Amino acid sequence: MLYQQISQNKQRTVVLLVVFFALLALIGASAGYLLLDNYAMGLVLALVIGVIYATSMIFQSTSLVMSMNSAREVTEKEAPGFFHIVEDMAMVAQIPMPRVFIIEDPSLNAFATGSSPQNAAVAATTGLLEVMNREELEGVIGHEISHIRNYDIRISTIAVALASAVTVISSIGGRMLWYGGGSRRQRDDGDDDVLRIITLLLSLLSLLLAPLVASLIQLAISRQREYLADASSVELTRNPQGMIKALEKLQLSQPMKHPVDDASAALYINEPRKKRSFSSLFSTHPPIEERIERLKNM
């Protein structure tokens, strides 16, 4: 059951990424048709913008991410218990030892960052280190090490970059069409070709809806990687109860004291900000009760 869950989560992520690239191609083709009367040109430009966004975000400095989250690097001497758990989990996962950081915050949380295992880092709040026992900490750190081993940070970064690219292209396309697309519309207004009119309407609709769809896909990818990291943590520790108990404590945690931006929030094991009441479709994290239920069903 464990390996089946891991396999299913990986497959769902692949499907979502394929849909994401298809959406980017669609929005590019739509913008190209409306503004340049050239599907191919718009499609190519959209993919180029997507690749540039993703590349620039993937190579964002690990130290910069830690600085944005008020994390300070610690040595083995400063935090031996935490350091050794990270070291043990990294050894089991067969990845290089990541850098270790602590965030001075009473809430219970942790996250990992880095585009590859070679430049990764793990951070935990002081609240997490004080409240959780070793079994629970192993579950949490196993979760974060799994993110590193599974290249989740890179995948999530690509998803954020693609969502940003879709939004930018849609916004630019909409503004150019509004301010300078009169000739395109006038020509179509007198055209009896029903197919051309339908194509125009569908292109306009895609420009309007693409940013929302892109955000939903990006959030769905984030949730799938959380499920995968939970299951992968159990694979590393061989102890589902440790992860379950950790999640039960995380469920009772208060929001973090320092502000957390949207990009950083998706990295944490638990939503670091105040819980929102709307649908989980718009959340970076799946409900903790669902995560616990999946672990119990392994």
Swiss-Prot record:
<dbReference type="GO" id="GO:0004222">
    <property type="term" value="F:metalloendopeptidase activity"/>
</dbReference>
<keyword id="KW-0812">Transmembrane</keyword>
<keyword id="KW-0482">Metalloprotease</keyword>
<dbReference type="InterPro" id="IPR001915">
    <property type="entry name" value="Peptidase_M48"/>
</dbReference>
<comment type="similarity">
    <text>Belongs to the peptidase M48B family.</text>
</comment>
<feature type="binding site">
    <location>
        <position position="147"/>
    </location>
    <ligand>
        <name>Zn(2+)</name>
    </ligand>
</feature>
<dbReference type="GO" id="GO:0006508">
    <property type="term" value="P:proteolysis"/>
</dbReference>
<keyword id="KW-0479">Metal-binding</keyword>
<keyword id="KW-0645">Protease</keyword>
<feature type="binding site">
    <location>
        <position position="226"/>
    </location>
    <ligand>
        <name>Zn(2+)</name>
    </ligand>
</feature>
<keyword id="KW-0862">Zinc</keyword>
<keyword id="KW-1003">Cell membrane</keyword>
<keyword id="KW-0472">Membrane</keyword>
<feature type="active site">
    <location>
        <position position="144"/>
    </location>
</feature>
<protein>
    <recommendedName>
        <fullName>Protease HtpX homolog</fullName>
        <ecNumber>3.4.24.-</ecNumber>
    </recommendedName>
</protein>
<dbReference type="GO" id="GO:0005886">
    <property type="term" value="C:plasma membrane"/>
</dbReference>
<feature type="transmembrane region" description="Helical">
    <location>
        <begin position="197"/>
        <end position="217"/>
    </location>
</feature>
<feature type="transmembrane region" description="Helical">
    <location>
        <begin position="14"/>
        <end position="34"/>
    </location>
</feature>
<dbReference type="Pfam" id="PF01435">
    <property type="entry name" value="Peptidase_M48"/>
</dbReference>
<feature type="binding site">
    <location>
        <position position="143"/>
    </location>
    <ligand>
        <name>Zn(2+)</name>
    </ligand>
</feature>
<keyword id="KW-1133">Transmembrane helix</keyword>
<dbReference type="GO" id="GO:0008270">
    <property type="term" value="F:zinc ion binding"/>
</dbReference>
<keyword id="KW-0378">Hydrolase</keyword>
<feature type="transmembrane region" description="Helical">
    <location>
        <begin position="39"/>
        <end position="59"/>
    </location>
</feature>
<feature type="transmembrane region" description="Helical">
    <location>
        <begin position="158"/>
        <end position="178"/>
    </location>
</feature>
<dbReference type="InterPro" id="IPR050083">
    <property type="entry name" value="HtpX_protease"/>
</dbReference>
<dbReference type="InterPro" id="IPR022919">
    <property type="entry name" value="Pept_M48_protease_HtpX"/>
</dbReference>
